[in-house]
Structures are given as C-alpha cells and as structure tokens.
C-alpha cells in the first residue's frame, strides 16, 4: 500500500487521503480549526464543565439523580416545553435538539461528509494548523436498551432530521458518558503507513496553517460553502461574513509572505 502524508495541503490530496475512510462503511468526520483542541463536547469544556459527585452505589446516576450537565439539560427541557410544542420525546433526541439550540451538552458533532469536516477545519484561525478527524464508531445508541443518565463510554447517535442543517451536513453525534474524557486519536508522525481502516478507530490529519486558505478557496470553488451547510438566512449571512474574513486573512498573508 502506498504511504500517505499525514498533512493535508491541497483539496485533491485531502480527498485522496479521506477516501481511505469510506462513509458508506460507517466512518464519520470532524473538522476543528485548531489542531491542538481536544475532542471534547461543550459540556466537558470550561466554563461549562462541573465535576460530578463521587459515585454513590446506593444512588446511581438516573433521571432523578443526574450528573451536573444532565441536570442542566433536565432544567432546560422543563423550560423549553413552554417555548416549543415539538420537543422530541426521546431523551437522546431531545439532547440533540437542545444542542442544536445552543445548550452545552455531552454530544459532539460529527458528519458523514468528509468535505464538510474539511470546510470546518479551514474556516477560521488561519494562523494555526487545523485538523480533520476520521472516526469509526464501534458502538451505536440503542434507544430500547440505553439509558442516557447511566450511559458510560462513547457511542454514535443518529437523530431524525429535525432541521435542514442535519440533512445538509450529514450530521451525526457522538455521546460521551464522561463529557470531560476526550477521545484520543492515533498519532502518525511522518506517514500513514500500512493503513488498515478496519483496525483504527480514530485518525487525525493535520492541515498546516498556510494550507487552510488554499483549501478553503478550493472548497468554495466546488460548492462547499456556509450556504450549502447552513441552508437558511443565518447561513447566508454567515457566508458573507466568512468571505470577508477570508479576504482579510488572504491579503494579510500576501503582505507578510
């Protein structure tokens, strides 16, 4: 098998590498603008994370005795019922619904579209390297047997498309039993040698800072924009904002080669 570089420099080269992780086989992708950021859901990051109480075998985690972030979700859910008549009945689907509307939860967004992940990795922070992660989930949420409040480990969650963004972004979520326990990727130093997708769960590919502007423009040229990923007025407006930030960063780079 031919070796592949760990760094993504151009769109054609990125596609060549990311095709090694077919979404039809279940691979998911996530792009982050800063390669140093951990793979943590928002509920596990400062200032939103609150340490859970020590485990009490007499009172295990439950809806009535939830971890701090799920207690916050319970409170949100009670109040949200007064604002919306379409709250999902399922605990898992409602958690995704809450995340969609900005609540810090123990869900981390992923996508089945590698180019969407690449877009998010190159969208900003042009002065630092970004990263695209490829993840093969070994476990999926079974709504008939899984309990949100006592869940441990990590598992993939698929939800009904309650918003057009879910469809446009080919969205999926990874649920964390402990929101402060980051996923840890395989680190490849020089080359991805003898890659065997069936044995690797999580792969990290770095995008050097100078390459982000190039890849961002190439993605726009093939129709991957904020408007396509966020098909609403907010996405349209943010597309104009992104373009302005891109031009500013591009001009700054030309002045300081």
Feature names for model-found ranges:
Residues 1-257:
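Catalytic-core elements of nucleic-acid end-processing and repair enzymes
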């Amino acid at each position: 098998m031919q070796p592949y570089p760990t760094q993504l420099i151009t769109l054609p080269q990125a596609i060549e590498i990311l095709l090694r992780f077919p979404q039809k086989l279940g691979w998911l992708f996530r792009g982050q603008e800063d390669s140093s950021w951990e793979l943590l859901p928002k509920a596990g990051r400062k200032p939103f994370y609150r340490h859970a109480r020590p485990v009490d075998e007499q009172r295990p985690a439950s809806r009535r005795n939830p971890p701090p972030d799920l207690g916050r979700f319970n409170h949100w859910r009670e109040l949200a019922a007064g604002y919306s008549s379409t709250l999902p009945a399922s605990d898992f689907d409602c958690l995704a619904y809450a995340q969609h509307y900005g609540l810090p939860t123990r869900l981390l967004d992923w996508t089945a579209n590698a180019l969407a992940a690449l877009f998010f990795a190159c969208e900003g922070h042009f002065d630092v390297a970004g990263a695209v992660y490829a993840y093969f989930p070994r476990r999926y949420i079974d709504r008939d047997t899984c309990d949100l409040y006592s869940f441990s480990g990590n598992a993939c969650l698929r939800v009904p498309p309650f918003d057009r963004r879910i469809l446009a972004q080919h969205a999926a979520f990874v649920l964390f039993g402990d929101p402060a326990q980051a996923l840890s990727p395989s680190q490849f130093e020089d080359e991805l040698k003898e890659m065997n997708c069936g044995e690797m769960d999580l792969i990290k590919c770095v995008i050097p800072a100078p390459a982000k502007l190039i890849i961002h423009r190439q993605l726009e040229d093939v129709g991957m924009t904020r408007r396509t990923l966020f098909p609403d007025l907010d996405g349209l407006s943010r597309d104009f904002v992104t373009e302005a930030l891109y031009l500013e960063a591009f001009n700054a780079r030309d002045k300081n080669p």
